[in-house]
Design a protein with these regions (language model features):
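Protein kinase-like catalytic core scaffold
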Residues: 33-37
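Contiguous C-terminal substrate-recognition/catalytic subdomains in enzyme active sites
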Residues: 30-32, 51
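Peripheral (often C-terminal) accessory segments that flank ATP-dependent C-N-forming ligase machineries
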Residues: 62-146
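Short beta-strand micro-motifs enriched in acidic
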Residues: 26-30, 107-109
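Generic alpha-helical secondary structure signal
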Residues: 2, 6, 127-130
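Active-site and channel-lining beta-strand-loop segments
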Residues: 23-28, 38, 121
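Active-site "cap" helix and flanking loop/linker of ATP-utilizing ligase/carboxylase catalytic domains
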Residues: 3-22, 39-87
Length: 146
């Protein structure tokens, strides 16, 4: 995490850009960290801040655009963002009824493609990331990658 933060700070200092951006990483099985890409602007994935921190990307983008100081980001809780695809629809509907620490956002008509993104699930709560991962794994929703 510290290396990721160092890289993001280095990228931010190097860019002549004002606004929200994302740095996406790839980690190999040996633990080597690579920058996958840099995305300027708002992203769906950054919505995780809505439920895990004291800021959201939309307000920070506006503050940046008008020259206001940005908030100091304070983590409020840990969280996972899970992508839900069409083929997982039935399985995720069951979890919707069962999980009180999951938040769901579904998209309108995504078509018939099984791999189309149906929505996102934010899994939050507690301070134990391993416990959240286990909760997700126990559902087996993401085990069957059709």
């Amino acid at each position: 995490l510290k290396e990721m933060q160092r890289i993001v700070k280095s990228v931010a200092a190097s860019l002549e850009y004002r606004g929200v951006f994302s740095v996406n990483f790839y980690v190999t099985s040996t633990g080597t960290l690579y920058v996958k890409n840099i995305e300027p602007g708002l992203t769906s994935i950054a919505n995780i801040y809505d439920v895990t921190a004291n800021v959201n990307q939309y307000e920070e983008q506006l503050r940046s655009a008008v020259g206001m100081p940005l908030h100091v980001i304070t983590p409020l809780q840990i969280g996972l963002l899970m992508v839900v695809r069409n083929y997982q629809s039935r399985a995720i509907q069951r979890q919707w009824l069962l999980k009180n620490n999951w938040q769901f956002r579904f998209f309108n008509d995504v078509g018939d493609d099984d791999q189309a993104i149906l929505g996102f699930v934010w899994v939050t709560g507690g301070d134990n990331l391993a416990a959240l991962k286990n909760q997700v794994d126990d559902t087996e929703v993401w085990n069957d990658q059709a």
